[in-house]
Amino acid sequence: MNNLIDTIKKIENILYSLERILKQECHNLLKSKTSNEEILELIKRKKILFKKLIILSQDRLCLEKEYNIFPPYESNNKLNNYWKKIINTCLILRKLNLKNKIIMNKKFYLNQRFLELSSSYKKSVTYNLDGNLEI
């Protein structure tokens, strides 16, 4: 049973780390002079944490089968408390992720729109003195 508790604690720690990274990503997206390298570094760190989370979740499932206990762990108060913390953290992560997606879409939509306007401005169609079209 202690193995299961340790695994759930590790999962909780990883989720808190993901929360910090998502908050940092949000902060970087809101700054106007953030380089793409900083955002890519955060994405790499998130990938590493997600891989660890997947491995720990598989371990948790195996331990649950072994001990014949499943979420929300009503029979064990300690596990139940940790599980509630994990659920709350997951809800926070979901909100942060949605917020980051919205910010990212707005930021890159504006950049794309600027590039489209810039290219259309440079490639404007005009008439020359002879009345012929020029591009």
Swiss-Prot record:
Query: What job does this protein perform?
Result: Required for the efficient initiation of filament assembly.
The family database entries (Pfam families) matched by this protein are listed as: FlgN
- Give the subcellular location: Cytoplasm
One biological process GO term for this chain? bacterial-type flagellum assembly
Which family, according to the similarity comment?
Answer: Belongs to the FlgN family.
Q: Can you say what this protein is called?
A: Putative flagella synthesis protein FlgN
Q: Which InterPro entries match?
A: FlgN-like, FlgN-like_sf
In terms of superkingdom, the source organism counts as: Bacteria
